[in-house]
Amino acid sequence: MREYDDIIYRNQWISVEEVNKGWSEDKKFHIKTKDNKNLLLRICDVSQYEKKKKEFEIIKELNKKSFNMSIAIDYGVCNGGKSVYSLYSWIDGDDAREKLNNLSKEKQYNLGIISGKYLKEIHGIPAPNHIENWEERFNKKIDRKIDNYKKCGMILENDDKIINYLEKNRELLKNRPQCFQHGDYHIGNMIITYDNELGIIDFNRFDYGDPWEEFNRIVWSAEISPEFSSGYINGYFDNNVPDEFFKLMLLYISSNQISTVAWAKSFGEKEIEVAINQTREIIKWYDYYRSYIPNWYMEDMKS
């Protein structure tokens, strides 16, 4: 018996095709039903039940908002009690990483604006009251990441500049608000539909924290489309971006990058090379930390 065969909807499905894209630990399947619907099935170990229940409930809450994303259908236990499944509607379209550069720069920018507005809506869900103070929480994360980097045996060029920025800008973490976070918000988790509209996918890394921390993943978008990434920032802030945002974005990007080689070691030489090259590029964006605004950022499309 396959792990999804005891799901109550199984007899309505005419095809089940595994999807191998992305870094998620979930198994993902594209399902076609007898009544010509496309669905996304996610399966993981039953030990993740409470997390998947919470993810499903949050997506149901987000479904009330105005942006394009998968609709939550059902979740439950399958595979003889060994797994938990989540069933969602499927968003038809292309991976934004592959499609963006086929669009005009203006369209890329406009889709970026939409992505920023979507993220602002996502951040409308508040964090639980009992959550740890952000300054304390993130300072621990910085300490842990620097420590892991120093122990990993790999050396990033200009690592002193990265660590120095982190150490000198910890005060930016004071009094930061917290909210629901998508957890991995970048073009790798976005779909461009066949009508050239934007869809958001893969909420499985959701968390709670400073809303601006979400921009730590912007590097994956900026590498492919500076126009999209500029629009993303401007759309989020409705074209009124505070100076402090750029300083904090660099703090969060720096925190990510100092730990990226230690993370990449688990995945082999190819990922290590990606991490090293990406960090080298980011340092150039910021003129070797002489600027806290990346060189690709445009206040508008005329810049």
How would you label these PLM feature ranges?
Residues M1-N11, I113, E121-G183, N234, ...:
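An alpha-helical support segment within catalytic cores of ATP-dependent transferases
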Residues E17-N133:
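ATP-binding pocket architecture of kinase catalytic cores
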Residues K52-E55, W212, S230:
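Conserved strand-to-helix beginnings and helix N-cap segments that scaffold or border functional pockets
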